[in-house]
Design a protein with these regions (language model features):
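Conserved acidic catalytic loop of the alpha/beta-hydrolase fold
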Residues: 93-110
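Conserved HGGG/HGGXW glycine-rich cap/lid loop of the alpha/beta-hydrolase fold
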Residues: 7-80
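Flexible "cap/lid" loop of the alpha/beta hydrolase fold
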Residues: 137-166
Length: 297
């Protein structure tokens, strides 16, 4: 299994490295510091060794190569929606290779892999490419790549792809973006927002990286048929009020992967809100340990 084109990702670890490893993959253009630290601590308290890498083109990880113009991105989205093939500087499978290289670097032979949004798509590609190294898969607020459900609703997609203008406070712009797709009533404190912006600013051209990541999503295509051949214990968690990726996208993954478990959370949007940290941490940790028991049988 080759990962010759993989990039070395920046990462942080939490907990005891002798415990079962859980790799958490963040979403589109977002640095790993966006994983709420109290949520990570809950996973550590439940006996997991948590690894949070920055995906390529995010945070402190290397930037990808290739320029994608806004015009090219627009026409690529149209081609994808119509069922056409898209070429890109890299694919989600290439991003999965980055994760496998990180596992090699950390000496992790097998890991539980979880991801939110785009990170959940990368996690699927890790499992599809390296089932023998994937102890379990957790898909949070994500999709299978089916153009009918997996691109996102245009209004919400526009909100996350539109950069702030010169007159807009970046902190207020980020808050409004998160509120546009997140759980109604969820708040984001200034320290958290500042930390995310500071980490994102480590990329010389964050918007160029976001466009490359979207192109990677488009180029990967529809994974539904491949997911039907997946034999990795899979948990799908999806907000029932997700304004970006409809809950049907999560149900579609669960329907494709045999033996998977679907957990819909009423009122939750496209985020991991404070009010559901414990519920999600409990579900993820339980899934990891159930999967480990199944593997030993």
């Amino acid at each position: 299994m080759s990962t010759s084109g993989a990039l070395s990702l920046s990462y942080k670890t939490y907990g005891d490295p002798h415990l079962p490893p859980l790799i958490l993959l963040m979403g589109l253009g977002t640095p790993s510091v966006a994983w709420p630290r109290p949520f990570i601590d809950m996973l550590v308290q439940r006996g997991l060794y948590v690894v949070t890498p920055d995906n390529r083109d995010a945070g402190a990880s290397p930037a990808g190569k290739g320029l994608v113009t806004s015009r090219e991105l627009f026409f690529s989205i149209m081609r994808y929606v119509l069922g056409g093939r898209v070429t890109a500087p890299y694919t989600l499978t290439d991003m999965a290779d980055d994760v496998l290289l990180l596992m090699d670097t950390l000496g992790i032979r097998r890991a539980h892999v979880a991801g939110v949004s785009l990170g959940g798509m990368i996690a699927q590609c890790v499992a599809l490419k390296a089932q023998h190294r994937t102890l379990s898969l957790t898909c949070l607020s994500t999709a299978s790549g089916n153009p009918r459900t997996g691109l996102g609703k245009m209004k919400a997609l526009k909100a996350i792809l539109t950069p702030p203008d010169a007159q807009t406070d970046p902190r207020e712009h980020l808050k409004k973006t998160m509120q546009a797709v997140g759980t109604p009533g969820e708040t984001y404190d200034d320290d958290f927002v500042t930390a995310v912006l500071k980490a994102a600013a480590q990329q010389k051209n964050p918007q160029a990286g976001v466009r490359r990541q979207v192109m990677a999503l488009l180029a990967e295509g529809n994974r539904t048929a491949k997911l039907r051949q997946l034999f990795v214990p899979t948990l799908v968690i999806h907000g029932e009020s997700d304004p970006l990726l409809p809950v049907a996208a999560g149900k579609e993954i669960a329907a494709a992967v045999r033996g998977s478990t679907f957990v819909g959370i009423p009122g939750m949007g496209h985020d991991i809100p404070k009010m559901h940290w414990k519920k999600i941490a409990d579900a993820v940790a339980r899934h990891c340990y159930d999967a480990a028991r199944e593997t030993r049988l």
